[in-house]
Amino acid sequence: MNKIKAAIIEDEVPAARLLHEMIQSLRPDWEVMILPGTIEESVEWFHVNPHPELLFLDIQLTDGNSFMLIEQARPDSMIVFTTAYDEYAVRAFAVNSIDYLLKPIHQERLLQTIERFESLTEKYIRDFNRESRICLLYTSDAADDK
């Protein structure tokens, strides 16, 4: 199985480190990166690096809000917003985030989010594999008809 790659974009270094430690304690086999805490630097990073499967994204960054980052970088990651502000929740779900964590983040709540990600990922893989088998069966049947 491939190692899950997760990234954190947070402009407050202590908060980024704490979230990193919390994720690693819950999923020590994951590769967790702390990315630059600005929109500009993070957009540049996304343009030249493979996107992580899961992105923990603070809404308020030093140079704007993270919705700008999403518009510019277009990450193909599943997104979890982390913020001290609850007024962005509706907008966060409008951009297909899988969760919205209010700071301070509690370990139990983070675990629920990680389990939601794992559940969604497993469902995607099951659906993809099912569709692949259907395509293979269809292709095989078509070849047999010739």
Model-found features: residue ranges?
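Conserved acidic carboxylate
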Residues: E10
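Single conserved hydrophobic/aromatic residue that forms the stacking wall/gate
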Residues: Y138-K146
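A generic structural motif
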Residues: R27-M33, S77
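Acidic, metal-coordinating helix/loop segments flanking the phosphotransfer/catalytic sites
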Residues: H20, L35-L54
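CheY-like receiver
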Residues: E44-W45, P52-E131
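Charged phosphotransfer/docking patches of two-component systems
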Residues: V13-R17
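Non-catalytic signal-transmission and effector/linker regions of two-component phosphorelay proteins
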Residues: M1-K5
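Alpha-helical interaction/dimerization surfaces of two-component signaling modules
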Residues: M22-L26
